[in-house]
């Protein structure tokens, strides 16, 4: 049994013996080579040695830009430098890198003469508008500020903030000399004295920042965009600047990383330069996924978390006033309680609307233009006879061969997938203006008359596989043939943003000329300041969702009961979109009396979900007609889940729909403010509490509360801050409903205890848990009612 180990133990001995003989025989040669290398190293400078090390550490395949691996990965955005170039930029001394890459004192990025007018969005600076509100630019200098009146240009463009991503003393050998006071090529005080906010985030050149640091930058950028337009610069305004803007787009619109990179590069060529920077955007996208997850029980699913863990994630995303307000309270708890009180008191949901920049139309327009430009090039190569052989796939293959920004249609597929399903409706209705000037409308009509693709329609939507229809496509992009196929024109008009702002608003009245004025659901003031105000695919229009009239928000006139709203009616071509087009091109309208009809009027196609919504919405006018006391009792019954109106199964379906919305779309936080059914709101809130990994009040907490039950008024303060504030938020909502029947209050407390503890009354320790917490909760309600009576204060 011991023989095999002995034979194996001899192997290392023999191996070391032969290795030793081999090394001893070659020792003189090794010493000679080392001597030659050391003598050569003395001649070379340390920087040259670093360059040689960088070169030698890169394989031949990595040095070859035509490597087959790179060709296979051409479907995704690729770095602008080779691996050799990236490593050299990290080892070459700063002054050498400046002279080689930028031009040294004659730095091309700081020389306006090197760039065309199109490359100078702000004259005198190499700059580009990535969106209508975000300017990417090279660093300015004191000389440039004075020579080209940059600050005056900033004012004329509405730029209110400048974000500097450089470190003091960086690129000292490039362009104009650095200012001794600041370490930059300009003095920040020059901007601040002009009323322009200045932010500085030190970020190493060609490097990346930590994900939490980037998230902080993005939140600051979000806040700055609420004040006005933002200018961002590093040195050239390409690498670090592009990364920050791409991360902002990911944060604000839920774009994928590659979509954001493609979009930024389309507006600012050569942005996001290194592999590390590309990886940074992709990792930031993954970093946000669990932070955005609210309901772990539905798609997109994630691991369940405790209340404390959720509050930590929430703090990462919130900022400003909202972050301070909701430091220890889950947003969904606070919002549902507030909405419930607003419904009970028949108050308007929102009091103020912030001036919000919208990104959705810009993104759609840019992507559409990127595709259209390539289609135009392809169509110009073929005459009408050759159009039969033209297919979208062939164009996409040609895109890849040309190595253009949009290398494949699949890269942007997630961005358009939902819109294709939903008839390509425009996005972000809550964030875009609902009234347009005459020039806007004329420009919209001219786009349709010229056969050009509108902002919200991707060019692929007009492509088809029928060769005869493809001839119509060629004419669609030809200025000589402005005539459109009527079905296509109907599609275009139905998807154009000017005709589709009826989802979230109800008509307030009519202008003298008969045009519609829409009411708009607004955002609560405390939520406005810190929300991401540029949603992308999150606010896509769903033609199946109805417009629920809210009589509480319609101004009462002398004949308010006879107010009319215009309902879009389909008359031809089987169209049933939000606004159908008659043969004369005018939008068909007919008045509908909302007051006399027991059912709510809706716009657009009715899907399975909207059918249910219409049934629920039919009760809304009835709720608004109830007295204040009746509405308060109804809200309390909703908290207790004493549902007497809608079927529980239907409420469950709607709750599941809201769970998915809140998980996948930022705009859901605004849309939920339009939910008027208190039973749906309360069921949504309790479902969130019950899906936590651990109950809000754990078994250990209960043991502690049972021991301290004698002092019921102070018992809740023994819990953690998050537990205490979450429970108090719900109890404050109950107090704000004022006087409600005792049996209803008992039912509300029982429902709250069940949700907070995940314990049923008929379980083993159920009676002890319920009696203990009911005593504590009732004592807390008494104290709060006494405080409210002495010092009345508004709701949550």
UniProtKB/Swiss-Prot annotation:
GO terms for biological process: cilium assembly. SUPFAM superfamilies: (Phosphotyrosine protein) phosphatases II. GO terms for cellular component: cytoplasm. It is an enzyme of class 3 (hydrolase). PROSITE patterns: TYR_PHOSPHATASE_1 (PS00383), TYR_PHOSPHATASE_2 (PS50056), TYR_PHOSPHATASE_DUAL (PS50054). Residues 126-297 form the Tyrosine-protein phosphatase domain. The keyword Transmembrane does not apply. Pfam families: DSPc. The active site is at 234 (phosphocysteine intermediate). The modification Phosphoserine is found at residues 435, 437. It comes from the Eukaryota. GO terms for molecular function: protein tyrosine phosphatase activity. Its EC number is 3.1.3.-. Keywords: Cilium biogenesis/degradation, Hydrolase, Phosphoprotein, Protein phosphatase. CDD domains: PTP_PTPDC1. PANTHER family: TYROSINE SPECIFIC PROTEIN PHOSPHATASE AND DUAL SPECIFICITY PROTEIN PHOSPHATASE. May play roles in cilia formation and/or maintenance. Belongs to the protein-tyrosine phosphatase family. Non-receptor class PTPDC1 subfamily. This is Protein tyrosine phosphatase domain-containing protein 1.
């Amino acid at each position: 049994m011991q023989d095999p180990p002995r034979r194996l133990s001899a192997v290392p001995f023999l191996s070391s013996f032969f290795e030793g003989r081999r090394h001893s025989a070659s020792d003189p040669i090794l010493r000679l080579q080392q001597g030659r290398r050391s003598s050569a190293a003395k001649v070379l400078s340390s920087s040259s040695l670093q360059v040689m090390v960088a070169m030698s550490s890169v394989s031949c395949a990595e040095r070859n830009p035509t490597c087959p691996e790179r060709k296979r990965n051409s479907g995704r955005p690729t770095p602008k430098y080779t691996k050799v170039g990236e490593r050299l930029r990290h080892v070459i001394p700063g002054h050498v890198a400046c002279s080689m890459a930028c031009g040294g004192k004659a730095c091309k990025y700081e020389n306006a003469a090197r760039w065309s007018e199109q490359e100078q969005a702000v004259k005198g600076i190499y700059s580009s508008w990535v969106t209508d509100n975000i300017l990417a630019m090279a660093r300015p200098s004191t000389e440039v500020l004075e020579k080209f009146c940059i600050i005056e240009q900033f004012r004329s463009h509405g730029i209110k903030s400048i974000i500097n991503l450089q470190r003091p003393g960086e690129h000292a050998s490039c362009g104009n000399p650095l200012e001794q006071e600041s370490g930059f090529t300009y003095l920040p005080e020059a901007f601040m004295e002009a009323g322009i906010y200045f932010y500085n985030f030190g970020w190493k050149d060609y490097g990346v920042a930590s994900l939490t640091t980037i998230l902080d930058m993005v939140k600051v950028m979000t806040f700055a965009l609420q004040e006005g337009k933002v200018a961002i610069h590093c040195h050239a305004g390409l690498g670090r600047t592009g990364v920050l803007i791409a991360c902002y787009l990911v944060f604000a619109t839920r774009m994928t990383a590659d979509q954001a990179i493609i979009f930024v590069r389309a507006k600012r060529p050569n942005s996001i330069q290194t592999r590390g920077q590309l990886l940074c955007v992709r990792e930031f996208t993954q970093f946000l996924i669990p932070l955005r997850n609210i309901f772990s029980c539905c798609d997109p699913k994630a691991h369940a978390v405790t209340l404390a863990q959720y509050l930590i994630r929430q703090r990462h995303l919130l900022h400003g006033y909202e972050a301070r307000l909701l430091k220890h309270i889950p947003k969904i708890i606070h919002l549902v309680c507030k909405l419930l009180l607003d419904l009970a008191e028949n108050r308007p949901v929102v009091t103020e609307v912030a001036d919000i920049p919208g990104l959705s139309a810009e993104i759609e327009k840019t992507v559409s233009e990127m595709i259209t430009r390539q289609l135009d090039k392809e169509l110009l190569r073929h005459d009408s006879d050759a159009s039969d052989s033209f297919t979208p796939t062939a164009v996409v293959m040609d895109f890849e061969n040309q190595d253009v920004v949009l290398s494949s249609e699949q890269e942007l597929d997630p961005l358009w997938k939902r819109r294709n399903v939903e008839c390509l409706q425009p996005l972000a209705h809550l964030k875009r203006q609902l009234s347009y000037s005459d020039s806007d409308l004329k420009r919209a009509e001219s786009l349709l008359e010229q056969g050009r693709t509108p902002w919200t329609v991707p060019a692929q939507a007009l492509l088809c596989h029928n060769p005869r229809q493809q001839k119509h496509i060629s004419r669609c992009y030809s200025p000589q043939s402005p005539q459109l196929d009527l079905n296509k024109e109907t599609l275009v008009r139905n998807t154009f943003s000017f005709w589709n702002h009826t989802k979230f608003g109800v008509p307030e009245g009519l202008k003298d000329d008969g045009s519609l004025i829409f009411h708009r659901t607004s955002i609560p003031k405390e939520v406005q300041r810190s929300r991401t105000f540029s949603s992308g695919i999150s606010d896509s229009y769903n033609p199946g969702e109805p417009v629920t009239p809210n009589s509480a928000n319609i101004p009462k006139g002398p004949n308010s009961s006879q107010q009319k709203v215009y309902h879009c009616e389909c008359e031809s071509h089987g169209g049933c979109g939000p606004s159908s087009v008659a043969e004369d091109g005018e939008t068909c309208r007919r008045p509908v009396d909302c007051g006399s009809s027991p059912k709510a009027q809706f716009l657009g196609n009715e899907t399975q979900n909207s059918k249910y919504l219409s049934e629920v919405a039919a009760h809304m006018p009835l709720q608004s007609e109830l007295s204040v006391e009746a509405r308060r009792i109804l809200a309390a019954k909703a908290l207790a889940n004493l549902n007497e109106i809608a079927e529980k199964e239907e409420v469950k379906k709607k709750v599941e729909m809201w769970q998915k919305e809140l998980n996948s779309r930022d705009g859901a936080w605004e849309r939920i403010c339009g939910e008027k059914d208190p039973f749906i709101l309360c069921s949504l809130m309790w479902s969130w509490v019950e899906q936590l990994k651990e109950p809000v009040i754990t078994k250990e907490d209960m043991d502690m509360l049972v021991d301290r039950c004698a002092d019921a008024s102070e018992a809740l303060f023994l819990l953690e801050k998050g537990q205490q504030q979450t429970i108090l938020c719900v109890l404050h909502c109950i107090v704000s409903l004022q006087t409600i029947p005792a049996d209803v209050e008992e039912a509300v407390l029982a429902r709250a205890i069940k949700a907070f503890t995940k314990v049923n009354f008929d379980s083993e320790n159920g009676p002890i848990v319920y009696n203990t917490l009911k005593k504590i909760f009732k004592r807390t309600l008494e104290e709060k009612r006494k405080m409210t009576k002495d010092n009345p204060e508004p709701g949550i």
